[in-house]
Amino acid sequence: MSSHPYVTQQNTPLADDTTLMSTTDLQSYITHANDTFVQVSGYTLQELQGQPHNMVRHPDMPKAAFADMWFTLKKGEPWSGIVKNRRKNGDHYWVRANAVPMVREGKISGYMSIRTRATDEEIAAVEPLYKALNAGRTSKRIHKGLVVRKGWLGKLPSLPLRWRARGVMTLMFILLAAMLWFVAAPVVTYILCALVVLLASACFEWQIVRPIENVAHQALKVATGERNSVEHLNRSDELGLTLRAVGQLGLMCRWLINDVSSQVSSVRNGSETLAKGTDELNEHTQQTVDNVQQTVATMNQMAASVKQNSATASAADKLSITASNAAVQGGEAMTTVIKTMDDIADSTQRIGTITSLINDIAFQTNILALNAAVEAARAGEQGKGFAVVAGEVRHLASRSANAANDIRKLIDASADKVQSGSQQVHAAGRTMEDIVAQVKNVTQLIAQISHSTLEQADGLSSLTRAVDELNLITQKNAELVEESAQVSAMVKHRASRLEDAVTVLH
């Protein structure tokens, strides 16, 4: 600690119920500090533990006060006084320090200090005294925390009760002897008076002083935390009851400390188990969160794919409807073609009939021409001109017959082709009808697929929303588990701190 620490002379007032507690080892290094002391001092627990306790000492405190405190504590006695401590930021606070040695197995193992708020009157009383002590301009000193005068008068407050009683008895004997001398009493009277005073003094010490010393000794054992048995007086008056009460208080404190220590150990074990379980739950919950988030991502991808498939199916449905309409129109066109081919076949048949008629006419004309030639030959010279005409007519009839035969052949060939074409057109018509029917079936299937895809999209959307809600719930659970882990860690820390505090008194 610096010989001139930074100070601001700014007072930090404490609440009435403020209690600061700390313990040190035999070399005055801090071994434990309660949360209130940590908060008021401005340091962290890690900064305080293992450090000398004078790190909170204010430079305005006189060295004589701490010298008196250590002198008293090392004698195994408690010390109480007003102390000005320094905070980490340089501010200060006033407390009434109650220090006591911690005795274990008859030996001092450390020191404990419990500090409460000092009143304004106490501060006003000691502040000028501390300044005077630092300046060396005072006739007073500090003895076991009390402000006393220097010299033999200052020793009177520290006299043991036994010597106080003896002093009073001696003073009474002197006064009595003076009275006897004044009345000129014989020497025997002096001796008798001396014996009476001695007997009274011995009786007073035996009946009053010694029991009070026992009470003080018992109370000191309770205050220092020393394990002890209850001392008893074979009397039931106020002193006997007081000693019993002090002893009972020590037993109750010991029972309370042992019970709390046992409970704290159970709480610590439970908090460790809870912390371990919470950590495992936190890990599992985090894995669940990751899995749910991965599921959400997969569901979103599936939803996008289903939406895309739904759009594709809808487009395919529209295309299938268009194709179905086109197929229907093609079927109607094919029906028209079939009808046209049937009409062509009928026309071809009629042409064949007409050709046959022309052929018959040519045949008849040829016969008539032959008959005319015969008649022209019979007529001689007069029938030559008619014979020439008859020859031409026969020639034309022959050509007509030949042409009719050629037309007949063409018509027969065309009729065969028309018949074949008609059969093919009818077959194509039937195929077109099948295509139209299949296209209608495909259209219906695509419509069903589109409807099913829409239903799947709706169902998947609902499932995605449910998974999203599950994700939110899982995340909230993860947050709750994290809060539980923090609370568990806090409980574990508090249990550890409480165990440390109980260990101080155990």
Curated annotation (Swiss-Prot):
Record keywords: Cell inner membrane, Cell membrane, Chemotaxis, FAD, Flavoprotein, Membrane, Methylation, Transducer, Transmembrane, Transmembrane helix
Regions of this protein lying in the Cytoplasmic compartment: 1-166, 210-506
A GO CC term assigned to this protein in UniProt: plasma membrane
GO molecular function, one term: transmembrane signaling receptor activity
Record membrane topology: Multi-pass membrane protein
CDD domains: MCP_signal, PAS
Compartment annotation: Cell inner membrane
Record domain Methyl-accepting transducer: where: 263-492
GO terms (BP aspect): chemotaxis; positive aerotaxis; signal transduction
Keyword Transmembrane helix: yes
Keyword match Nucleotidyltransferase: no
InterPro entries cross-referenced by the UniProt entry: Chemotax_Me-accpt_rcpt, HAMP_dom, MCP_chemotaxis, MCPsignal_dom, PAC, PAS, PAS-like_dom_sf, PAS_fold_3
PANTHER family, A to Z: AEROTAXIS RECEPTOR, PROTEIN ICFG
The protein's name: Aerotaxis receptor
Organism of this sequence: Escherichia coli (strain K12)
